[in-house]
Amino acid sequence: MQRNHSNLYAPCGLYCGVCRIYQATLENDLAYLKRLGKLYARRFPQIAALSTEELQCDGCLSARLFPSCQVCAIRDCVQAKGIEGCHACADFPCEHIDEFPIPAGKKAILRAVPYWRENGTQAWIQSEMERYHCPTCEERLYRGVKQCPVCHSIVDLD
């Protein structure tokens, strides 16, 4: 399946290309999606009853979204304002960011949006793609990871 990479430009600044849910969908790794579903069900209990197919996501701006992303105040706000993302909004950071339900995501948003605003979309994407690698072994990592699964180095990428 050919992917539309513009679907990965989440308006909030969380580049979907480094999201483990997106990567598991891309790789058709249903076992990993099931594990992620159990993890996310701790914060979003309604996810527990969903099938792995219902957990798949093709990126924030696609038609197929992870359940907790289907209702997104940030995406709705950006679309209502007719702007590309929070980086183009004079009100950033706002109550939508303050109320973001996932602490690691909120931290990444607060880091990424100013960079996106200052450097533009392509530089922001490149920066996000480069950031999420293990500094010890160069293994590809994902947002929220605290330890490299290959060399077990502790990482603080967000």
Predicted regions, residues:
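Hydrophobic scaffolds flanking metal-cofactor catalytic centers in soluble metalloenzymes
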Residues: 1-87, 91-118
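Short cysteine-rich clusters marking metal-coordination/redox-active sites
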Residues: 57, 86, 134-137, 148-151
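Phosphate/adenylate-binding glycine loop and adjacent helical scaffold
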Residues: 3, 17, 136, 154-158
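Short Cys/His-rich micro-motifs in 6-15 aa windows
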Residues: 77, 94, 152-158
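Broad hydrophobic/π-residue packing in well-ordered secondary structure
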Residues: 94, 123-127, 147
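Ferredoxin-like iron-sulfur electron-transfer modules
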Residues: 7, 48, 54, 122-140
